[in-house]
Amino acid sequence: MKVTLGVRTSAGTTGAAAWEIRAAATPGRARLLELGFFLAAATASQYGLGRPQAIGDTPTSPVDFLPEDPNDVITAALIQSALAWGTGPTVPLAYLRRIYLPATIGTGVIWTFPTGIVIPVSGSLVLWNIGTNGVVDAYAVVDI
């Protein structure tokens, strides 16, 4: 089943997560198939996609990803989005992808992963602010 969600990030602080995609303990591994994000402010920005050393703790307002097919039945909190936390995720040791975007509103990227990047059980992937960044409009497609 494919689930998706679009968000606007709220934090552009250097060395912090802009967005976390979190998987629950069930139904098992999820796979990120596509991630796109586009600058919503004219700020040169540098982002990385990676697995944090530790997931964020106590997300303040997690949002469930939505099924692409409205007939699919999905349990709450299987795949969630987090933009703020009691304690944020920690920096990835390495990045699966990284990009530098010029200070032009609407500039962005769509990363596709044909076989999917695994989001570990009870783990996450983060879009990481490598530099001081502007906010972005972002979306992700995940297969569960």
Task: Cite the ranges covered by each PLM segment.
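Surface-exposed, low-hydrophobicity beta-strand/loop segments enriched in small/polar/acidic residues
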Residues: 1-144
